[in-house]
């Protein structure tokens, strides 16, 4: 009886679960339909989703005839959603009952939610994606135009957040304009849509780490309405504070004009954008020199004129294909460059640059999960450099530089580049693969120093007409060559767990003028988050290769002894060195046969915390090791006997990759985008050391590169950058950019060629560290005294008297041979700068419909360096200079810029 009762209860319980399910199966229905475009053409592979009120989601993809279906759909109310790239998404409500559901007919329209034609294939945003790192800096067009910048230059903002250590010996970041790599931004400022720094730092698509590159996207035209914009900026000395080294309140004026027009070209399938800007800059440079006649100050006009023109069209050729064509032209004429500080007005030189670029891109999305882009790029760059004076150059260390600049150069470069890249999503994987082929054709003419250069150790040597060196180039100044660069990459970003994502990839770099072809760059990145996604931890590591710069090949081909010869005379006559016979030994330039591409190894660990809807705090540590960095070494420098290994030559400079660097930095960040406030804050604690400053850097001791190991030229322990915009009532905006930095180092040199290698970059030895900083002793062999006797340097060089001194009574010692003071031991000045902008927008007429344009005018007032704090550039590091340890140049003091912008 008991057993029978248990079985009865079991059957009742089971039937209570199975019977409703059986009834539900009997009531389940079929939901089906077709998807087509406005012309009636069926759309294949559209994404279709069916959402239930309970939160469940069913997914389907249309077949070749645009058909979709969902089987086993229970009764209830549902939301049907259809999406396809390039079209506006469609949503419709439907009810499913016991009877058959009517077949759905969905018609897609071309997307007009966005005013630009775009096409892309990607998943919905995931905080774990490699390109969603909160440590990146993303500045859209609205934020860029609101921040206080001189002449609306967007790079003035983004350069604040670039890590110079990520560029190794190439100090400037790489700039990618619409995916094309370059060194400058040659498009109008108003054509910039957005700028990004440090997005997806380990992406194999790029050769540089994230903090060493700037990605710029240009603007496309609107599909719905026409926009016309006109802006004008002016800065005038009458509104500015006087520069610290300007003794006469010199006049100066800068004017900048920009305009743009964009809108639909052919219906809503084609758009255009045309823009340009013009800069008229009459700036000043300030000379602070010590000549034979005494202290000399002068203000020199530095006129500059630039023009940029830009045109772009975007056409939706088919629903799945977009053709984009961009052309830009630029002209830059800049006179009296190089003047200021120790450089007298006659040392000026002028440059004229012309650039043309054409970019054609075809973007296709054959399926919602696949995107392919092909880019054809062609560029023409014409650059000319010429000196104001052709007189021989006179370089007096630590005092003044006069004569001509001895610069005469013409560069013509023609570039052709092909890019192919693809993104493919499959299951838990996101694949990225592609390649770049770039050919560069160069015609290089360099007649620099054909007029000769005299070098003096100090002002006393100049007064006594005793230069220690004279150099002069002779021969054929023209070379032509080509350089081919190839790179290809592959990466897979995969989801290992719901809150764990891994990126692995490989990049391979090849270059035609390098015999080493094993530049393989593996990358790996890992991202993990908490269940709610508000805390993300990222780690990564990778190798990044540099390309050999074309300037290295240019200099090698020109000065290897087959085109030009460089004559070097020690202890020449002055002002005439005399005739230079053909028998004088030359100096040549060679390339290390074992040279290869420099590379950096980067590793990082960081955390990102989302505090509110749009509030993020970040912290990350980055280590970067540079290996095989560029440098130059004189392999024919005198040995201990005073003789050169190859007596038929003076100097044999050799380009090589023997340098190294090491950088560590910790960065704390805060970013918020609230209703009225946008704020970006970055604080960086860093330290960087290396033993080379770049391709042309010569060590003080040519037999000991490691002796140059010291603080990097750009090393700054502390950097704090803040950028923000506060929207005030009545269409007022208040914006700020502030920068606080500790000092960069400066190198302390003796001013003499103490090791007889014809280069006055030798450093002193250390005396008594407690003696006055500007006190030094000099061996008599350098100042017509007794060799081996130490004399007071200031009295001998500045007072004209030889007074013996004890080594314990001076801070520095100038002795024959190599000094023991390290490189970059001087500590430069700190910097503090705050820039503000107050703007007011007046709406003249609001848009009445989606094809109309709001007409408005905006007034802006910018104040740069509102604190009016004197920020020196750096200190003089030449011991033999009367102004050793003092500044001779400063950044601009407080400046005011007034602007007006029309939009209609």
Q: Where are the regions a protein language model picked out?
A:
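Periplasm-facing N-terminal accessory domains of Gram-negative outer-membrane beta-barrel systems
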Residues: 21-128, 132
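Transmembrane beta-barrel strands of outer-membrane/channel proteins
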Residues: 121, 230-236, 274-280, 325-329, ...
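Short loop/turn motifs that connect adjacent beta-strands in outer-membrane beta-barrel proteins
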Residues: 187, 204-206, 220-226, 266-270, ...
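Hydrophobic, lipid-facing positions within transmembrane beta-strands of outer-membrane proteins
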Residues: 210-212, 226, 255-259, 307-311, ...
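Transmembrane beta-barrel wall of Gram-negative outer-membrane proteins
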Residues: 250-333, 350-377, 507, 522
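Short, solvent-exposed micro-motifs at the edges of structured domains
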Residues: 513, 596-601, 610-904
